[in-house]
Amino acid sequence: MNVFGIGLPELIVILVVALLIFGPKKLPEIGRSLGKTKRAFEEASREFQDEIKRQTAALEEEQQAKAEAESPREISP
């Protein structure tokens, strides 16, 4: 088992140290807080990416419209 590049023995050591530092009553609360923080970070990241995509699309449309306006149109005789 390899989670985030951390093997099972390392993960067990980390959990034991966390248990010793925070105690069994605080660990669920800390886990919830970390989960909420991770979720909020992912949401903010997703919103940022969506905004970048919207801005890029708007710029591309603007450039395309400008190019179409500047290009000479052929007139049929």
From Swiss-Prot:
Its main location: membrane. Residues 56-77 are annotated as: Disordered. This is Sec-independent protein translocase protein TatA. It comes from Thermosynechococcus vestitus (strain NIES-2133 / IAM M-273 / BP-1). The lineage of its organism: Bacteria, Bacillati, Cyanobacteriota, Cyanophyceae, Acaryochloridales. GO terms for cellular component: TAT protein transport complex. It is a single-pass membrane protein. Forms a complex with TatC. Disulfide bonds: none annotated. Part of the twin-arginine translocation (Tat) system that transports large folded proteins containing a characteristic twin-arginine motif in their signal peptide across membranes. TatA could form the protein-conducting channel of the Tat system. Residues 63-77 have a biased composition (Basic and acidic residues).
